[in-house]
């Protein structure tokens, strides 16, 4: 009996040792999202929530002061989100720009989204890193418009995003991203992973046939590291946010990871929808609706805004979880859940717990569970 007990103890110790060793060998991918002046707050939120979809990754934000303090020593990859590229450059400061470039060249990864892609470019007369081999053209018409844009994958893109490989076109949110061509002044050569198929010229007197047939995703090596640049916003597109952690994996030379079916939903948008000037006017009017409109008007506004993936609505919907109309509260929860907005999960849970009407509480609870189900 004593020997049996000893054997059991030995087996337990061996199991614990093996489990600990496995956990140590399974390296966590440490990702940082730059949170500096010039980065749009919602773009920062969305980059963070996209990384949360990958169970092997941890994510934090970091500031320009954090760079100087050595935060890059504790990161494997960084993301520079949307906003204003040159403003982000100014906020970092030249010494920190040098530190970031050295970090990437040492064998680490970097993903630039929209303004981040601008920042990584080699654009003349523009404050940028000059690390992706591309230059932005037609900057004078940068405010050319936004909306759900279409793109096609190249052969390299199909390898990285096999979930989209059989689709002739896929769709994500575009918001005034750079129009790239190869830089004559750079020795860096990039690979195109996707091509922009939408011709965006709705605003700012932008010329036609400028954005279409231009790179949508590009990637390259930089020293021992890798850089991925996206001109558009998968992280802000329901069902497509998973593309961001996939890009991070590419920058680190890591194998792709399959994400859950409720995370990979490319059929949420199956057609182009570029916001017209009339749409923008309508969108702006709904701010007043949410302040002064009836419950029916608010619900109709949320319907319209969700279909068009309104850029502004994601800032307005948070407070509607606490509207005085139960129907509006439910519709706001539905909007947040169906747009994958994990940033508002704590608000959703608070609204659920504070709700007094049982039918409304049950409905909000369903949407809370739908949102939580996105997480690994």
PLM segments and residue spans:
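Aromatic-Pro/Gly-enriched surface loop or interdomain linker
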Residues: 22-74
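A glycine-rich, often tryptophan-bearing local segment used as a flexible ligand/cofactor-contacting loop or short
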Residues: 86-165
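Catalytic beta-strand/loop cores that center a nucleophilic Ser/Cys/Thr
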Residues: 149-223, 231-235
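Amphipathic alpha-helical scaffolding segments comprising HEAT/armadillo-like alpha-solenoid repeats
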Residues: 279-289, 310-322, 341-353, 375-376
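Short inter-helical turns and helix N-cap capping residues of alpha-solenoid HEAT/ARM repeat scaffolds
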Residues: 293-294, 324-325, 356-357
């Amino acid at each position: 009996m004593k020997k049996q007990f000893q054997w059991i103890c030995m087996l337990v110790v061996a199991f614990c040792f093996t489990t600990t060793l496995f956990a140590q060998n399974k390296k966590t991918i440490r990702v940082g999202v730059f949170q500096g002046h010039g980065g749009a707050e919602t773009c920062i939120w969305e980059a963070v929530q996209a990384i949360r979809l990958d169970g092997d990754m941890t994510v934090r934000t970091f500031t320009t002061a954090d760079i100087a303090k050595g935060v890059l020593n504790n990161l494997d990859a960084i993301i520079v989100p949307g906003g204003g590229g040159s403003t982000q450059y100014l906020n970092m400061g030249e010494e920190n720009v040098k530190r970031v470039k050295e970090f990437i060249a040492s064998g680490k990864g970097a993903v630039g989204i929209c303004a981040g892609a601008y920042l990584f470019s080699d654009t003349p007369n523009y404050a940028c890193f000059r690390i992706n081999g591309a230059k932005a053209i037609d900057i004078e018409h940068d405010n050319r418009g936004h909306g759900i844009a279409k793109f096609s994958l190249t052969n390299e893109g199909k390898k990285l995003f096999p979930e989209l490989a059989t689709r002739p076109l896929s769709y994500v949110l575009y918001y005034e991203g750079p129009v790239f061509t190869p830089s004559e002044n750079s020795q860096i050569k990039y690979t195109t992973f996707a091509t922009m198929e939408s011709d965006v010229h709705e605003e700012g007197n932008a010329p036609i046939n400028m954005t279409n047939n231009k790179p949508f995703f590009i990637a390259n090596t930089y020293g021992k590291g890798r850089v991925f640049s996206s001109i558009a916003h998968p992280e802000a597109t329901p069902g497509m946010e998973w593309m961001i952690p996939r890009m991070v994996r590419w920058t680190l030379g890591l194998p792709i990871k399959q994400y859950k079916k409720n995370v990979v939903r490319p059929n949420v948008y199956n057609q182009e929808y570029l916001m017209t000037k009339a749409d923008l006017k309508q969108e702006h009017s709904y701010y007043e609706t949410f302040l002064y409109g009836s419950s029916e008007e608010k619900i109709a506004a949320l319907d319209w805004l969700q279909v068009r993936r309104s850029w502004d609505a994601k800032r307005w919907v948070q407070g509607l979880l606490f509207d005085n109309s139960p129907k509006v509260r439910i519709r706001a929860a539905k909007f947040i859940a169906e747009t994958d907005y994990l940033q508002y999960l704590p608000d959703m849970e608070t609204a659920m717990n504070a709700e007094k009407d049982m039918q409304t509480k049950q409905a909000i609870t369903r949407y809370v569970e739908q949102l939580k189900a996105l997480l690994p």
